[in-house]
């Protein structure tokens, strides 16, 4: 009954932590493609090939349902995967859906025409690849009209977090927020469009100001997954053991992951498919 969680590196651990707390009875298998991280500077074809390989590995681990806890993969690969690659007995879900549900206050199954929503000015902070894909704006446009989205590519932040350099990460976040606010001085809401960024949520909030509502994905994804599994209990795979897989150095990744989650995490090495 295992569920897979995939990320290019360690950022998806924020999602894993939230879904594990929300669904303690479900075993989760986490796959971090640390060898190829970060994805945010790769082109769409490269991201697609790496993501399909990772998802295939999680299927081999008995996870019929896989969460792409990586915004770059969700933006650059998910639609193509769902349209032409994922078999009918498997599911791959991305992390944009819960964000857009929260922002527009309407369910994903609601296919009525787009309508006006309360929030008009949204700041999007994401990797360069996610920003260039315009996937968030495209999905939002299906459900809402009249929303001005200003996107800021946050180069360097993921690398700093993966390296454990939180001082550099904070400086970069403040610089990126300042750059965005020169173009959109008064955003009403901010989307942290990378699963690494919740680790810096307090810094984003401080730099943006207390009056800006900051949407972070981990809790939203956890609630969305719980709802999905209630409606589709058959998508719990045959895998029964939780685990942590990495294409990187397992000792180094384990040490960093333990620092991330403040509990002992042990990864085992796998070869990328």
UniProtKB/Swiss-Prot annotation:
Organism domain of life: Bacteria
* UniProt EC number: 5.1.1.3
A Gene Ontology BP annotation from the UniProt entry: cell wall organization
Which catalytic reaction applies to this protein?
A: L-glutamate = D-glutamate
The residues that hold substrate are 7-8, 39-40, 71-72, 195-196
Q: Does the keyword Protein biosynthesis apply?
A: no
This protein's pathway? Cell wall biogenesis; peptidoglycan biosynthesis
Please list the residues that make up the active site.
Answer: 70 (proton donor/acceptor), 194 (proton donor/acceptor)
Molecular function terms from GO: glutamate racemase activity
Keywords, ordered alphabetically: Cell shape, Cell wall biogenesis/degradation, Isomerase, Peptidoglycan synthesis
Protein family per UniProt: Belongs to the aspartate/glutamate racemases family.
Functional note = Provides the (R)-glutamate required for cell wall biosynthesis.
* UniProt cross-references to HAMAP family, sorted A to Z: Glu_racemase
Please give the name of this protein: Glutamate racemase
Species the sequence originates in = Dinoroseobacter shibae (strain DSM 16493 / NCIMB 14021 / DFL 12)
Q: What's the gene?
A: murI
């Amino acid at each position: 009954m295992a569920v897979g969680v995939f990320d290019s590196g360690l950022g998806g651990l924020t999602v894993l932590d939230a879904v594990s707390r929300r669904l303690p009875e479900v075993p989760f298998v986490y796959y971090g493609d640390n060898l190829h991280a970060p994805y945010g500077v790769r082109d769409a074809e490269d991201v697609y090939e790496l993501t399909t390989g990772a998802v295939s590995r999680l299927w081999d681990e008995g996870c019929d349902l896989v969460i792409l806890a990586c915004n770059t993969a969700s933006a650059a690969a998910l639609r193509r995967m769902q349209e032409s690659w994922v078999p009918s007995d498997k599911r791959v879900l991305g992390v944009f859906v819960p964000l857009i549900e929260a922002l527009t206050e309407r369910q994903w199954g609601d296919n009525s025409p787009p309508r006006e929503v309360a929030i008009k000015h949204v700041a999007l902070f994401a990797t360069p690849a996610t920003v260039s894909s315009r996937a968030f704006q495209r999905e939002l446009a299906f459900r809402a009209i009249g929303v001005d989205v200003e996107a800021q590519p946050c180069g360097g932040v993921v690398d700093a977090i993966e390296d454990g350099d939180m001082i550099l990460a904070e400086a970069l976040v403040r610089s990126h927020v300042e750059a965005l606010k020169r173009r959109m001085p008064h955003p009403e809401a901010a989307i942290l469009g990378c699963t690494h960024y919740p680790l810096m949520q307090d810094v984003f909030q401080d730099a943006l100001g207390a009056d800006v509502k900051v949407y972070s994905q981990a809790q939203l994804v956890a609630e969305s997954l719980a709802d999905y599994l209630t409606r589709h209990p058959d998508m719990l795979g045959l895998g029964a053991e939780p685990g942590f897989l990495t294409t990187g150095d397992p000792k180094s990744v384990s040490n960093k992951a333990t620092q991330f989650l403040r509990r002992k995490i042990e990864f085992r090495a796998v070869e990328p498919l």
